[in-house]
Amino acid sequence: MSRPLTKVTQQGDRIAIVSGLRIPFAKQATSYHDIPAVDLGKSVVSELVTRSGLLPEKIDQLVFGQVVQMPEAPNIAREIVLGAGLSVSTDAYSVSRACATSFQAIANVAESIMAGTVNIGIAGGADSSSVLPIGVTKSLARTLVEMNKAKTLSQRLKLLSRLKFRDLLPVSPAVAEYSTGLRMGDTAEQMAKTYRISREDQDALAHRSHILAAKAWEQGLLVDEVMTAHFPPYREALLEDNNIRKNSVLTSYAKLRPAFDRKYGTVTAANSTPLTDGAAAVILMRESVAKALGTKPLGYLRSYAFSAIDVWQDMLLGPSYATPIALDRAGITLKDLTLIDMHEAFAAQTLANLKMFASDEFARNKLGRAQAIGEVDMDKFNVLGGSIAYGHPFAATGARMVTQVLNELRRRGGGLGLTTACAAGGLGTAMVLEVE
């Protein structure tokens, strides 16, 4: 085990996470059909600040992320500052780390606090899979640029005459890795085959996720961390996540056909997370500032780690690479954790990572460690369900997970929690949280 790295300021202040909030997550093209990510982000940040009681001018920094970026608002963070009632002097910049984006935003604000340049900051993310940047073909794009430089009507008409009908068709956003051409589902299929994850086990995990998430809502465990969403034209409000199967039946999962490998595959729409719209954010501050304000933190950021692996094979193993580092930096072991929350991009990916947590062979050959970090106690794992049930607005998932784990730790009287996620590009992240 490497030497622990304490996440404190030069004055010895811990990084306090004092509150977190999200809007209900909605399946693509449902409740937020016409609402861009920037408006989802403005909504949650505005409500988060209002509930916190903080004066807007006290917020030094906002770091926010968006994975499916809109060309007209490339710096979503600054647009949120300007549109959510914050002070115009609040520093703001945007980040993107695929599905780990809001983890990165949290880390960035934490590092600003540790550096002494920020006392209070907001971190989060928003994404819309319903309002997408629809592109044009390369031929049309080039022609439009050249037309802008053309000086006469005849020159413009000549340029247009070169175009064919297919050049005028819209281009949807890419759903595959830029460097490999592989879709996320293709990678999930790779992992199912490599680590021998059965269809039955995948379906069982998905069913478990929906059952636990439905129970969490039924018991009122999420009401304080999920706001009511009400967007123009204000005809209806969304109070809960709309992807959760409240009456999930395990046998129904077997009826779906594979979504990626049609002939031999096991990954289906039901054991994968759906395309989702949503936003989430957290407020971080120096521990001494929280005390001065009389604010009781939800918890503290104990450690974090990021990882990167090759993208061609099984690239969604990020949690298996990042978690051992985060545990070492926190000075703890897997057994010390009260809760473990892993992003469920796919049931196959989740189960593969759980296997690698317990694999001594993987630890020796891939991590250079003498032994595995250990087998996960499923009574501690994704106890309120996971992304398969809640949905996955790419940049918002990390902030959802952090807030959810901190609140659950408080209900249990404190302890240590792990949040971890895979991400496109072979990336991964893990954060250790502490509640007293």
Curated annotation (Swiss-Prot):
**Assembly and interaction partners:** Heterotetramer of two alpha chains (FadJ) and two beta chains (FadI).
Record-linked HAMAP family = FadI (MF_01618)
Originating gene: fadI
Gene Ontology process terms (BP): fatty acid beta-oxidation
Source organism, top-level taxon: Bacteria
User: Could you tell me what reaction this enzyme catalyses?
Assistant: an acyl-CoA + acetyl-CoA = a 3-oxoacyl-CoA + CoA
Return the broad EC class.
transferase
Which of UniProt's keywords are assigned here?
A: Acyltransferase, Cytoplasm, Fatty acid metabolism, Lipid degradation, Lipid metabolism, Transferase
The transmembrane residues are none
User: Which compartment or compartments is the protein found in?
Assistant: Cytoplasm
UniProt cross-references to Gene3D superfamilies, sorted A to Z: 3.40.47.10
GO terms (molecular function) for this protein are: acetyl-CoA C-acyltransferase activity
Q: What is this protein called?
A: 3-ketoacyl-CoA thiolase
Report the family membership: Belongs to the thiolase-like superfamily. Thiolase family.
